[in-house]
Regions:
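Loop-to-transmembrane alpha-helix entry segments
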Residues: 80, 113-116, 132-152, 159-166, ...
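Transmembrane alpha-helices of multi-pass small-molecule transport proteins
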Residues: 46-95, 122-123, 175-179, 196-213
Length: 241
């Protein structure tokens, strides 16, 4: 009893997951992500790496603002304590974001969306393998039925897309699933800094590849700053049980 009280004061006991709150955040994030293809298709002249750079800049500004509002002067210290797994999560998220742009610009929006629909199944399989989380048999049957339907839709979309684009969409799904597993495993750690580091990785790579061509039209710049859905990916993963 004394130990539990001491741990509570120190902050080691994790609050119970708020499932409803997490589901709302996941719904918001998924809804915004579903419009990403439409937004990118309306970009006039910017190439993939220009879009990556300015999207990462927009995400970085939003996430840094949230971190500063939440922690104030102690926010910089949060960037130092994410550890090795936090760094891996940042790298996976950066990889997934870059792969998403490659997919959406090299195949159809439908083919990309169908492939990304496999994220819940990939994540569940990874959670079972790496975290030992159990999956009920009825859930497995439901997942298999849904996966079969998604596979049919994906096969129908292959004819209008490219092999490269579809492959990048699959890599994007793998990256997001791997990121979700790391976040799930580290629920007691503030993981918003991983989003900041992932954006820094993307910006660094984009600058290397297109440092001499960073000028965009006002229309393209505005569209690059529109999506902010990835800020909703951390809390739901940590809280859904």
């Amino acid at each position: 009893m004394v130990v539990a009280t001491m741990n509570t004061k120190i902050g080691y006991i994790e609050p119970p997951p708020r499932r409803a709150y997490a589901m709302i955040l996941m719904l918001i994030g998924s809804t915004v992500i579903s419009f990403s293809g439409l937004v990118i298709r309306n970009i006039d002249a910017a190439d993939n790496w220009q879009i990556n750079f300015y999207r990462a800049l927009a995400f970085g500004i939003v996430i840094s603002t949230i971190l500063l509002l939440r922690y104030g002067r102690s926010a910089p210290r949060k960037l130092k304590v994410i550890g090795f797994e936090g760094a891996c999560a940042a790298a996976l998220l950066a990889f997934a974001s870059i792969s998403f742009l490659q997919a959406i610009t090299n195949t159809t929006v439908a083919a990309t969306t169908f492939t990304l629909s496999s994220i819940p199944f990939l994540t569940a399989a990874m959670a079972w393998f790496f975290l030992g989380e159990r999956i009920g048999k009825y859930t497995v049957f439901t997942m298999l039925a849904a996966a079969f339907g998604i596979a049919l839709m994906f096969i129908q979309g292959l004819g209008s897309g490219s092999v490269y684009g579809n492959f990048m969409a699959f890599l994007c799904a793998m990256g997001f699933s791997g990121y979700a597993i790391i976040i799930r495993r580290n629920r007691g750690l503030e993981m918003l800094p991983t989003l900041i580091f992932s954006n820094l990785i993307i910006m660094f790579l984009a600058l290397i590849l297109c440092w001499d061509n960073m000028m965009l039209s006002l229309n393209d710049l505005i569209l690059c700053f529109v999506p902010v859905s990835y800020t909703h990916l951390t809390l739901p993963t940590k809280r859904i049980v």
